[in-house]
Amino acid sequence: MSKGLFITGTDTDIGKTYVTALIVKTLRKSGYDAGYYKAAISGAPTVAASDAGFVNKFADINEPEDMILSYLYQHAVSPHLAAQMEGNPVELPVVEKAWKRVTEKFPYVVMEGSGGIACPIRRDEKAKIDLTDIIRMLKLPVLVIADAGLGTINHVVTTIEYTRARGIPVKGVILNNWKGCLLYTSPSPRDRSVS
């Protein structure tokens, strides 16, 4: 049985792909046979030019494109809108089959989400699928990637509460884009008056 981890973020462009690539590369360099999978990507002309292509190359996985990604959309909008525009909606059985194939090959698999945890994946007359539906279907725990900046506490708490409210375990949080010390070190006016 394969061990899996789902990477989500508090927002889009938060560093999920970068952190995912580092995790997979570190696992592989440490002797763990780790793979990667992403259900849907929007805003990329080809798999090679996408987040999945970056992780595949950076982490030295070198898997065929159909092993790392199920749905590629060229429009740079959320997957549910891109699917409506391009006519190729995400199907849960396709994602489940692809996940099974990846987990049969790799004992450790890191799956990267699209956008944030509440990202809609499909919205049409046949189905309403959110990212959390995929995570629950695959029974994966989540690792949250957040930007180490103003507003982070709220974004992290909101993401964790939303995830847990859907019965999905959260394994941890990684603060990305950290610049310097997170502790406020300048004394307050009150502290400056004390001798």
Residue ranges and their predicted role:
Residues 19:
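Hydrophobic positions on the alpha1 helix immediately C-terminal to the Walker A/P-loop
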Residues 173-182:
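G-domain G4 guanine-recognition motif of GTPases
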Residues 184-191:
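Conserved small/polar residues in nucleotide/adenosyl-binding loops
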Residues 16:
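Conserved lysine of the Walker
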Residues 22-89:
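N-terminal phosphate/diphosphate-binding loop that engages ATP/GTP or pyrophosphate donors
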Residues 79-121:
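Phosphate-binding/switch loop-helix module in NTP-utilizing enzymes
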Residues 127-147:
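Inter-motif core of Ras-like GTPase G domains
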Residues 2-5:
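Extreme N-terminal starter segment of soluble prokaryotic enzymes
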